[in-house]
C-alpha cells in the first residue's frame, strides 16, 4: 500500500465517521432538511395507524417528527398535535406541510432534543416517537424522559428498528442504536402498563428494492 493509498483510505474512513456522527446530531439534520428535496414519504408510520386508530383523539406529542407526516395524520384524525424535533429546518418543513394539508390549526411545533427532553409540566394523551435512534443504547433514557409527558389515562407509543440482517451494511454505532421493545420496559414506571411489547415484521420497498425488517413496538398506558 502506498502512502497515497493509505491517506485516501484514511480520508474515506474519516468522512464516514463524520457522516455517522452527523446522523445523530442536529447539525447533520439541519443540513439534510435545508434543501428542497423531500426526504420522507409523508405517509404515517404503519404502527401509529395500527395502534392509534382506535384511541379517542385528544392531545398528542410526536417527538422526532421530521417533516411532519405523523403529525398531519394525527391532526386529520382529530388530535391536537405538537410536533417536536431538534432540527429547526425540519420543523419549518413540517409546518409548511401541515399548512398545505389544511391542519395548521390543529398543530404546533416545539424545538427539543429528545436526549435532553423535559416536558416542562406539559402532558399529553398520546406521546409517540418513531425511528428515533440515539447512539449507544440511549433509547432507554429517552423513554424515561418521554414517560413524564404522558397524562393519566394516556398512551406512550415507541417504534424503532429492531436489529436485523437487513442492516448489515451499517456500522457498529448504528447497530448499537437499534433496540427490541423488551429492552425499553425498564424505563416504564409502575403506573405505566405495557399493552404491546413486540417486534412486528414489515415489508418495505424503497428505490425499487424490497426488504423485510422488524419494527420494535412498545405501547403502554398510564393508569388514571
Predicted feature descriptions by range:
Residues 102-114:
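Conserved SAM-binding strand-loop segment of SAM-dependent methyltransferases
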Residues 115, 119-126:
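A short acidic, Gly/Pro-enriched loop at the edge of an enzyme's catalytic core
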Residues 87-89:
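Conserved SAM/SAH-binding beta-strand->alpha-helix loop
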Residues 2-55, 58-66, 164:
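Conserved class I S-adenosyl-L-methionine
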Residues 140-152:
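A short glycine-rich, Lys/Arg-flanked "PGG" loop and its adjoining helix->strand segment in the class I
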Residues 153-161:
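Conserved beta-strand signature within the Rossmann-like core of class I S-adenosyl-L-methionine
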Residues 125-139:
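A short SAM/SAH-binding and catalytic strip from SAM-dependent methyltransferases
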Amino acid at each position: 500500500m502506498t502512502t497515497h493509498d493509505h491517506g485516501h483510505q484514511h480520508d474515506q474512513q474519516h468522512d464516514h465517521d463524520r457522516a455517522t456522527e452527523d446522523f445523530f446530531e442536529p447539525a447533520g439534520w439541519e443540513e439534510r432538511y435545508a434543501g428542497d428535496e423531500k426526504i420522507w414519504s409523508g405517509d404515517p408510520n404503519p404502527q401509529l395507524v395500527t395502534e392509534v386508530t382506535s384511541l379517542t383523539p385528544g392531545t398528542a406529542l410526536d417527538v422526532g417528527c421530521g417533516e411532519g407526516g405523523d403529525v398531519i395524520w394525527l391532526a386529520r384524525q382529530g388530535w391536537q398535535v405538537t410536533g417536536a424535533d431538534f432540527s429547526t429546518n425540519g420543523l419549518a418543513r413540517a409546518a409548511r406541510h401541515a399548512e398545505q394539508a389544511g391542519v395548521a390549526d390543529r398543530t404546533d411545533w416545539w424545538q427539543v432534543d429528545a436526549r435532553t427532553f423535559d416536558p416542562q409540566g406539559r402532558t399529553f394523551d398520546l406521546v409517540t416517537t418513531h425511528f428515533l435512534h440515539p447512539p449507544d443504547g440511549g433509547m432507554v433514557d429517552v423513554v424515561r424522559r418521554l414517560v413524564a409527558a404522558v397524562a393519566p389515562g394516556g398512551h406512550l407509543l415507541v417504534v424503532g428498528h429492531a436489529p436485523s440482517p437487513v442492516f448489515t451494511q451499517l456500522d457498529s454505532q448504528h447497530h448499537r442504536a437499534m433496540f427490541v421493545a423488551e429492552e425499553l420496559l425498564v424505563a416504564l414506571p409502575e403506573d405505566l402498563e405495557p399493552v404491546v411489547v413486540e417486534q412486528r415484521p414489515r415489508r418495505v420497498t424503497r428505490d425499487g428494492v424490497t426488504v423485510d425488517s422488524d419494527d420494535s413496538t412498545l405501547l403502554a398506558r398510564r393508569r388514571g
